[in-house]
């Protein structure tokens, strides 16, 4: 979840075979880079979607001990800002409130106001139309990817070095990581510019486990 997961998966697809699962992306960006189409079907039914959490994958897969299990994490203060931009500029965005849509020309006060309102906005993330706060949904989904037994955790801040270690574990040499979705965030401001005391408290509270476990800070 905004920690280069799509890019890491895509980097490994050239080494996958016809029986391997590649969830891919619903967007055209990966095709323009020359990567494979999705292969996430069992028979006629797609069973693994992009960013499928471990509890969806492992019960229908082989024994977990047969696999190297790794994930990636990112400083949540930065990841939430990335999700803020993605929520409005993704091709399938369901957030239609363009009053909150960030713009590269926004000043810091405008960004702070939009960002705080975004954190406290309710949206529907399922077909049942149930509403929940965006920040709560994002934080709960994030936990699914590191609250399981893992063999390695890649830190977004050390992406290339950590991914090279994963490649070594599975017998691969150095692999270049494609930078997917990197054009979504249209502002070069440091993530701290987006925060007020209130928004800082919200993100700190919702990601307290991640912050404590990985020694992340607001800097």
Language model: regions and residue ranges:
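Membrane-interface amphipathic segments in extracytoplasmic regions
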Residues: 1-219
């Amino acid at each position: 979840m905004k920690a280069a997961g799509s890019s890491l998966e895509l980097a490994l697809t050239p080494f996958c075979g016809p029986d391997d699962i590649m969830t891919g992306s619903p967007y055209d960006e990966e095709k323009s880079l020359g990567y494979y189409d999705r292969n996430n079907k069992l028979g006629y039914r797609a069973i693994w979607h992009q960013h499928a959490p471990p509890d969806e994958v492992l019960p229908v897969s082989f024994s977990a001990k047969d696999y190297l299990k790794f994930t990636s994490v990112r400083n949540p203060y930065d990841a939430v800002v990335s999700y803020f931009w993605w929520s409005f500029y993704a091709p399938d965005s369901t957030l239609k409130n363009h009053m909150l849509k960030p713009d590269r020309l926004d000043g810091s006060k405008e960004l702070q106001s939009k960002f705080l309102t975004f954190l406290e906005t309710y949206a529907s993330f399922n077909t049942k139309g149930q509403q929940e706060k965006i920040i709560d949904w994002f934080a709960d989904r994030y936990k699914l990817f590191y609250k399981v037994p893992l063999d390695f955790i890649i830190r977004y801040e050390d992406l290339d070095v950590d991914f090279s270690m994963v490649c070594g574990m599975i017998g691969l040499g150095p692999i270049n990581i494609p930078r997917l979705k990197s054009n979504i965030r249209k502002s070069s401001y440091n993530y701290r510019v987006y925060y007020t005391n209130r928004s800082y408290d919200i993100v700190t509270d919702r990601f307290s486990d991640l912050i404590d476990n990985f020694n992340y800070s607001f800097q």
